[in-house]
Regions:
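Domain-terminus/edge residues, biased toward the C-terminal soluble/receptor-binding domains
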Residues: 57-58, 69-74, 78-287
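Active-site-adjacent loops and short helices of periplasmic peptidoglycan-processing enzymes
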Residues: 1-91
Length: 287
């Protein structure tokens, strides 16, 4: 596999290691970073698998930190897309590495060249990573952004780099031709709170988890509607983060996406002292 030929005891910054990994697929750099963070590669791989499970990567099992063929080291296009989405959404600095065409290390002695040719040919490309092994074939997770629409195209098992890039280009072209990014039309009168029975607080503050924008068929974004589903009242206790209802994003054919509405804060069951205080306050107000 690709490497930068790290020497025992050699020191590089994490920034330099990430350049080597993201630009030129340096497997030795990936293992070195795994050992630095996890203490050993196997421990780091355990963390990789735990994180994959958290993200919902149901068909992925990592056996090493660099992606080379190994018994039981498996993934799918769907899972690679989930992982890519997580990187782009919550670690956007990755684009600073994956969009670099050429760079150097060791004072210019080591040249890094990106194998993602879409960086030079595709409008709006933002990364992400190529990869090739004997079992997986020639692969890519390609990401691109145009007019607030961000897409990820994952291609596995190609027979050549040319086939890989052609397939990724076709997928991205299809996505940009058929879909658009639309504002989620949250109703202006959507409830901010709900009354709570038997609670220390009379009302629960609601948190809407709906994204600012969502995917829509091109030309239909302005026709989207949002419908709020909530109970009339709640009963304590209520834990912070509990799902209270949903905001359903709809088009003419039905629900496109259902986004949870959750409790922004906990509400405990009203204590005796709380009940007594409310009675006293009520009597004071009516006196």
């Amino acid at each position: 596999g690709s490497q930068i030929w790290l020497e025992p005891g050699e020191q590089l910054t994490l920034d330099e290691m990430l350049k080597a990994i993201c630009i030129s697929s340096a497997n030795d750099a990936a293992v070195a970073v795994a050992e630095f963070i996890g203490g050993s590669e196997p421990v780091f791989v355990e963390r990789m698998n735990a994180r994959a499970k958290e993200l919902g990567m149901q068909s992925t099992t990592f056996r090493n930190a660099c992606g080379l063929d190994e018994d039981g080291h498996l993934s799918t296009a769907r899972d690679v897309a989930i992982m890519s989405r997580e990187m782009l959404l919550n670690h956007p600095e990755i684009e600073n590495y994956c969009t670099v065409w050429m760079d150097t290390l060791r004072g210019g002695a080591t040249q890094l060249v990106n194998t993602n040719k879409l960086l030079k040919s595709y409008n709006g490309i933002t990364g992400l990573k190529t990869g090739t092994t004997g079992k997986a074939g020639v692969c890519i997770s390609a990401s691109a952004s145009r007019d607030d629409l961000r897409l990820i195209a994952v291609v596995l098992g190609s027979s050549s780099g040319k086939e890989r890039f052609a397939a990724a280009t076709s997928l991205l072209d299809y996505g940009f031709a058929m879909f658009e990014s639309a504002l989620v039309p949250i109703p202006a009168d959507a409830p901010k709170t709900l009354p709570v029975q038997k609670g220390e607080e009379p009302a629960l503050e609601l948190c809407y988890t709906a994204p600012e924008r969502c995917l829509a068929v091109k030309g239909q974004g302005s026709t989207l509607q949002a419908e709020v589903e909530l109970p009339q009242t709640l009963e304590a206790p209520i834990r912070e983060g509990s799902v209270i209802g949903s905001l359903n994003i709809k088009n003419s054919q039905g629900i496109l996406q259902s986004c949870p509405i959750i409790a922004a804060k906990p509400v405990d069951v009203r204590s005796f002292s709380g009940c007594f205080r409310r009675v006293v306050n009520a009597l004071w107000l009516t006196a």
